Amino acid sequence: MKFLCLHGAYGNIPAFRVQLGPMIDALEFDGSASFEFIQGRVSVVPPPGFESYFGPAPHYRFLKDRGEAEASAVEGIRVFPEAETPEDALRALMPRDDMEIGFADARGLALEQLYEALDADPEISGIIGYSEGASAAATLVYDEQERMRSEGYVPRIKAAIFFMGWPALTAENVPALSDEVENLLEVPSLHIVGANDPYKDGALALYNIFDDNMAVFFDSAGGHTIPRHGKLLQELVSAVKDLIADVPEDNSADLLAPAVTGKRLDSAVDIPNLSFLKNEDA
């Protein structure tokens, strides 16, 4: 399976290749997967004090806002709202009116680039996103499934891997939240989330919009970083291989079935125990 790879905010292709390097080496070694990287088209400058954190310039984003995110990204780490559910936390952090204005063009421009990448390489059938790149990747999955239901479009993305991340953006340029959307996303997905990630609720809200029977939760036992060493890396590679193996040859017909909302994750969830979640309702 060939994956389209999307870096995080203030990232670039060289930096993301390094971040994913150990996983890619293991998966390419035995031919399990191949990878195509694209770079965001929105040129940005890291927030003051974060220049070294994001590495050498240039820096890019996939989601274009109206200038507020540079401040909010830093402030969000310090004051991420406490709430009973990830969805409530996201609504408090990103009020709907602010999102509709601040991200008015973000979704359309990101989708334009991602569909161009799919058109340019017919072998791509999977997607990987890190942090903001996970939101952009999820936005593509969300749009493909909306188009499938409305116009019979056959989705290209058959599997998705999200490192941390945020929910997809809807046509209204607001986060797709599981307690607001009509349909969950029925695509095999792997969600890597760290218990110490300051943006954990964003990743949990992203996980919650995917069908429980097709989503796998992977505890990275860390923060907002990608596993790159030791046993955790081996387990990640194994999880990716399992994801690829579980993708049906043609799942377009299955996607037409209505989603059934199952167990969702709340903000107080004990992440180390989440690996057992998928088996509770089996």
Swiss-Prot record:
Biotechnology note: Liamocins have high bioactivity against the pathogenic bacteria Streptococcus spp. and can be potential new specific inhibitors of oral streptococcal biofilms without affecting normal oral microflora. Liamocins are also able to inhibit human cancer cell lines such as breast cancer cell lines T47D and SK-BR3 or the cervical cancer cell line HeLa.
Pfam families xref list: FSH1
GO cellular component: cytoplasm; nucleus
Expression triggers: Expression is induced by the cluster-specific transcription factor GAL1. Expression is also regulated by the cAMP-PKA and HOG1 signaling pathways via the transcriptional activator MSN2. Moreover, expression is also increased at low pH by the pH signaling transcription factor PACC.
Domain of life: Eukaryota
EC id: 3.1.2.-
GO molecular function terms attached to this record: hydrolase activity
Phenotype when the gene is knocked out: Completely abolishes the ability to produce any liamocins.
GO biological process: secondary metabolic process
UniProt keyword terms in alphabetical order: Hydrolase
InterPro entries, alphabetized: AB_hydrolase_fold, FSH-like_dom, LovG
Catalytic residue list: 131 (charge relay system)
Family: Belongs to the LovG family.
Annotated PANTHER family: ESTERASE ALNB, ESTERASE OVCA2
Purpose: Esterase; part of the gene cluster that mediates the biosynthesis of liamocins, glycolipids (also called heavy oils) composed of a single mannitol or arabitol headgroup linked to either three, four or even six 3,5-dihydroxydecanoic ester tail-groups. Within the pathway, EST1 catalyzes ester bond formation between 3,5-dihydroxydecanoic acid (provided by the HR-PKS PKS1) and mannitol (provided by the mannitol-1-phosphate 5-dehydrogenase and the NADP-dependent mannitol dehydrogenase) or arabinol (provided by the L-arabinitol 4-dehydrogenase).
Name of the molecule in the record: Esterase 1
Lineage of the species this protein comes from: Eukaryota, Fungi, Dikarya, Ascomycota, Pezizomycotina
Gene: EST1
